[in-house]
Amino acid sequence: MINKDYKKLYLVTDYRIPFNELLEKTKEALIGGVSIVQYRAKNKKTKEMCKEAKELKKLCDEFGALFLVNDRIDVALAVKANGVHIGQDDMEVFIAREIMPKDAVIGVTVHNKEEALKAIKEGADNLGVGALFSTNSKDDATLMTLETLREIKSVSNIPLYGIGGITPYNLNKDILENLDGVAVISALLNSDNIREKSKEFLNILSK
């Protein structure tokens, strides 16, 4: 059985980084303490995605980290990923739950209390909540207010991961007390020292 207990630091990959470089960066993040990796690859061919996902899954296995695939359930199944992460425009959660193995982890991006309740009811294991800050990784991201974050926290019985423009320096007490962890792209992958940046995040998240 896969351990679905939440982990605090969650890396989402950046498809704009050449894959060999991304693999090295991901390894550094795992050494630093990242415990979930989500493979996100927009506009890539399925064959290429399967190849890359397989390599990342192998790397995650070496570190005992969970490996999830964004959106593409077919790719997740092909490489025996630990689960998937789906957005509001992707497959319905209950359908994903029917297709994926019984112990698969299913994460869902939500933007308000109603979406959170629906995802939980349909079988989500964790929620990505945001965007908490402006981000270059998603052009159409709408910022979430602290009030909305608190509303989601009040109805959720599963882990919440903050997403969107998160750095070690903008995670204040009000935000942290409503999250179980954070999902990060740029703040880790664009860092000069990914390993140390991961540890910096974990230090803040552990307070």
Swiss-Prot record:
Query: What cofactor does this one take?
Result: Mg(2+)
- Quote the InterPro entries the UniProt record gives: Aldolase_TIM, ThiamineP_synth_sf, ThiamineP_synth_TenI, TMP_synthase
Pfam families noted in UniProt? TMP-TENI
What exactly does this protein do? Condenses 4-methyl-5-(beta-hydroxyethyl)thiazole monophosphate (THZ-P) and 2-methyl-4-amino-5-hydroxymethyl pyrimidine pyrophosphate (HMP-PP) to form thiamine monophosphate (TMP).
Query: Binding of Mg(2+): at which residues?
Result: D71, D90
Q: Gene3D superfamilies recorded for this chain?
A: Aldolase class I
The record's EC number reads 2.5.1.3
Q: Where does 4-amino-2-methyl-5-(diphosphooxymethyl)pyrimidine bind?
A: Q38, Y39, R40, A41, K42, N70, T109, K138
> Which residues span the membrane?
none
GO MF annotations for this entry? magnesium ion binding; thiamine-phosphate diphosphorylase activity
Q: Does the keyword Cytoplasm apply?
A: no
What is the organism of origin for this protein?
Clostridium perfringens (strain ATCC 13124 / DSM 756 / JCM 1290 / NCIMB 6125 / NCTC 8237 / Type A)
Pathway listed: Cofactor biosynthesis; thiamine diphosphate biosynthesis; thiamine phosphate from 4-amino-2-methyl-5-diphosphomethylpyrimidine and 4-methyl-5-(2-phosphoethyl)-thiazole: step 1/1
Entry binding sites for 2-[(2R,5Z)-2-carboxy-4-methylthiazol-5(2H)-ylidene]ethyl phosphate: T135, N136, S137, G165, I185, S186
Q: Which domain of life is it from?
A: Bacteria
Q: Which SUPFAM superfamilies match?
A: Thiamin phosphate synthase
Report the catalytic activity.
2-[(2R,5Z)-2-carboxy-4-methylthiazol-5(2H)-ylidene]ethyl phosphate + 4-amino-2-methyl-5-(diphosphooxymethyl)pyrimidine + 2 H(+) = thiamine phosphate + CO2 + diphosphate; 2-(2-carboxy-4-methylthiazol-5-yl)ethyl phosphate + 4-amino-2-methyl-5-(diphosphooxymethyl)pyrimidine + 2 H(+) = thiamine phosphate + CO2 + diphosphate; 4-methyl-5-(2-phosphooxyethyl)-thiazole + 4-amino-2-methyl-5-(diphosphooxymethyl)pyrimidine + H(+) = thiamine phosphate + diphosphate
Q: Which UniProt keywords apply?
A: Magnesium, Metal-binding, Thiamine biosynthesis, Transferase
Please give the name of this protein. Thiamine-phosphate synthase
For this chain's record, the cofactor binding note is: Binds 1 Mg(2+) ion per subunit.
NCBIfam families recorded = thiE (TIGR00693)
Gene Ontology terms: cellular component? cytoplasm
